[in-house]
From Swiss-Prot:
UniProt gene name: ureE1
One Pfam family of this chain: UreE_N
GO-annotated cellular components: cytoplasm
Matches recorded under InterPro entries: UreE (IPR012406), UreE_N (IPR004029), UreE_N_sf (IPR036118)
MF terms in GO: nickel cation binding; unfolded protein binding
Annotated Gene3D superfamilies: Urease metallochaperone UreE, N-terminal domain (2.60.260.20)
The protein's name in its UniProt record: Urease accessory protein UreE 1
Record keywords, A-Z: Chaperone, Cytoplasm, Nickel, Nickel insertion
Family, per entry: Belongs to the UreE family.
Species in which this protein is naturally found: Pseudomonas syringae pv. tomato (strain ATCC BAA-871 / DC3000)
Amino acid sequence: MLILDRILGQASDPALADRLHDLSHAGQVETLSLSGSDIQRHRLRLASDRGTDCAIRLERHQQLRNGSVLMLDSQRAIVVQMQDQHYLDLLPRDSAAALELGYFAGNMHWAVRFAGDTLQIPLNGPEADYLERLAPMLADGRVRRA
C-alpha cells in the first residue's frame, strides 16, 4: 500500500505542469477518482486507475481538490480527479417555501448551492432517497423539480 500524506500542489501549477506533461506522454500519470463527498475526506483508501493501492492520510488543514498532486517523482505521478457531481434541482413556489426548503436542507445537513431561484443539492447517494424525504413538499406543490 502506498501512503500519500501530503499535497504537493495542483496539476495546473506551472512548476508541476511540465513534469506531469512529460510523465503523461510516457503513460506514467495515475489518477485517483474521487466523489464529491470523498474529496472532502482527509483519510481514505482506494485504488488508482492503474490498480495501485493507495491510502490518503492528510492533515486537517490540507484539502483535496480536483487536480491535487499527491505523488510526483521521475517514474510516475498520482493526481486526484473529481468525478462529475450530479445535483437535484429544486424550485420553491414562493419565499415561504424557499425558507422552509432551506431550513429542511440544513436540518438534513445537505450541502446546497444556488443557481438563480433554484436550490441545488449535490447527490451523495440515490436520488430516490432525497426525493422520499422531500415528498411532502413536492406533493403539495411547495417545491417542484426544476
